[in-house]
Amino acid sequence: MNIITHIGELIGIVPEGVLRKQGAEMDEVGSLRDAYLTIEGERISGFGNMYECPVPGPQDEVIDAEGGMVIPAFCDSHTHICYAGTREQEFIDKINGLSYEEIAARGGGILNSADLLHRTSEEELYSQTMARVREMIAKGTGAIENKSGYGLTLEDELKMLRVIRRVKKDSPATIKATFLGAHAVGRAFKGRQNEYVNLVCEEMIPAVAAEGLAEYVDVFCDEGFFTVAETDRILSAGEAYGLIPKIHANELACSGGVQVAVKHNALSVDHLERTTDAEIEALRNSRTMPTMLPGSSFFLGIPYGRAKEYVSAGLGIALASDYNPGSSPSGDMRFVMALGCIRMRLTPAQAFNACTLNSAYAMGVAEDLGSITVGKLANLIVTKPVPSLAFIPYCHQTPFIAKVLLRGTHIC
């Protein structure tokens, strides 16, 4: 048994069986001051007041929190970290006034990453992806959803997903794989979008399923990318092979993606920078988690999602990093939490729940992660002594992590 002692405040306590928070629940953060927490194997086995702490046995490892907080490790439910190289020239293009759409129309953006990935060996792609995972763990993230979508050919999409499978096996973090062949139309299919959709549905999805390479299927349903009808078809094809739907929608325009996501009982609908009351209404009483990506809004200078309005309407939201080389080159969930507070006007409690339990829900791992709950995996951050939960997004550049534990093991 491992015992974490002298915890200044244990934060993120959630009763067993609660898998997401919605509406007013988003302001609730269960906590216990002057606490201990025990770990058996990989899982949380108990916690309580320090004066009730069990006496450690000779085989037990004791971690003294020294008055720091213990919180659940962040869950990042939307990333594209399996990519090759960098795209800082596009960063300069944006500074010089080109829009995301203009860069894409010139052959940059996603297609640029697809070209780089095609020229990169599987071994090198694995090395680059693992380096990003290690970076994210060091910043407190313990679960990562990882998408394909920079292949855009059958061979390169499979290459990406095989790399993600290796990362899942080798990393201490919890990794979930999403097939995103419908991220853009492959360069070889320019002007033949329907043929590319046929390729995704009739060749890519069956091949991905045959190797068991993904849990989820995703589509970029937005202006200039894939239509509602195409999205509907691709999600149906994925579901026929047991893949659970997720969707990119409403980053560039109100695309109808939210409605098709709800139709398919998608686990999450992500981006939502541009939504109306119709989208909020469509999400009521659905299983679909609205997921917002403030790092992308920050980097691209586009509107932020209407997070506060979603919560006021009784919905939950998740926040994720969208870590990718073109529109959000960062996997720092603490900064995501800060942007949720600073730019989206979420309270620290709301932003915390959005980055932990609700993001765990949005990647299908809330039964095991995202909260301090007996029986869940011990993916934990032990902080340096800090005054409050609000300090984390408030002083968002001040180092706050003392230790990261994943599956009960001290990683960094």
Regions found by a protein language model. Give the residues of each.
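Metal-coordinating catalytic core of metallo-dependent amide/deamination hydrolases
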Residues: L111-Q128, R134, G142-S255
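C-terminal cap of metal-dependent C-N hydrolases
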Residues: K21-M26, L357, L377-C412
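Metal-associated gating/positioning segment near the N- to mid-region
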Residues: E61, A65-Q128
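Non-catalytic positions within long, well-ordered alpha-helices that form the structural scaffold/packing
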Residues: I137, C201, A209-A210, E239, ...
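Active-site-adjacent C-terminal substructures of enzyme catalytic domains
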Residues: I244, C254-S371, T383-P387, H396, ...
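Conserved beta-strand scaffold positions in the cores of enzyme catalytic domains, especially
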Residues: I3, D60-D64, A177, V404
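N-terminal metal-binding scaffold of metallo-dependent hydrolase/deaminase domains
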Residues: M1-P56
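Divalent metal-coordination and catalytic microenvironments
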Residues: I7, L37, E42, G67, ...
